[in-house]
Amino acid sequence: VDIAKLDKKQLRDYRRQMQIIFQDPFSSLNPRMTAGDIVGEPLMVHDIAHGERQKEMVAELFERVGLRSGQLTSLPHQFSGGQRQRIGIARALALNPKLIVGDEPVSALDVSIQAQVINLLMDLQNELGLSYLFIAHDLAVVEHISHRVAVMYLGRIVEMTDKTSLFDMPLHPYTEALLYAVPIPKSGARTRTRKIVEGDVPSPINPPSGCHFHTRCPYA
C-alpha cells in the first residue's frame, strides 16, 4: 500500500494498524501530559474508548508493559529512561496494531535496561502475535530479537535473509565487513583474516549507479 496516495480517512484507518516506538524515550513523550493521558490519547483520537473505559484500558496496558496503575497520573520526568520507553510501548499497543516499527528503541538506554525492554518486546510478540520492523545498528540486539534481517547501505537493501544464515554465512561483502567489525573478547577466537571496508562513504544524495557499494567493494 502506498500510504502517500491515501486520503485522510483512509490514512486514519490505516494508522490504527501501524504504530511506532521512537528512539529517544526522553523527547518522544509530551512533558505536559500525564503518563495515563499519553497512553490513552490514541484511544480517544480513534474513538475507541472514553471516560472510565479508557482509564481501565490504559491501566491494563500499563500492567502489560510492567508499569503500575498507580503511575498513571505521573508526569514523564518522574520516570526512568526504561520506564519512559515502556510508556512508549504501551502507547504503541493501545490500538492493537498489526505492525510496530521500532526506530532503534533501545539504543538510548543502558545495556541492562536494553535487555529488559528487548525481552518485553519479544514476550509481547509471542503473546499478541505482533510483527516488528526493528531498526537497529547493534548486531547483538539484531541477532537476539530478529527472525529475518535486512542489511542496508546508503538507503538500499543489499542483503536480506533469515537470521541464522546472515550471521553464519553472510553473502554480501558489506555484511561480511559489518560482522567482522564486531570485537570478540576471546584470544584466538577469530582465525580468518579480518575484512576491512576501504574508501569513503559516497554521498547519499548522489549515490553510485548500480550497486551502491561497488566503489568500496573488494570484488568489484
Predicted regions and their residues:
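Conserved ABC ATPase "signature" region
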Residues: 2, 53-70, 176-180
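ABC ATPase NBD coupling module
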Residues: 2-19, 45, 165-170, 202-208
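Charged, flexible cofactor/metal-binding loops and thiol motifs
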Residues: 69, 162-220
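Conserved ABC ATPase signature
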Residues: 75-79, 83
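Hydrophobic anchor residue at the start of the ABC signature
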Residues: 89, 113, 117
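A short, proline-enriched helix->beta-strand linker immediately N-terminal to the Walker B motif
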Residues: 94-98
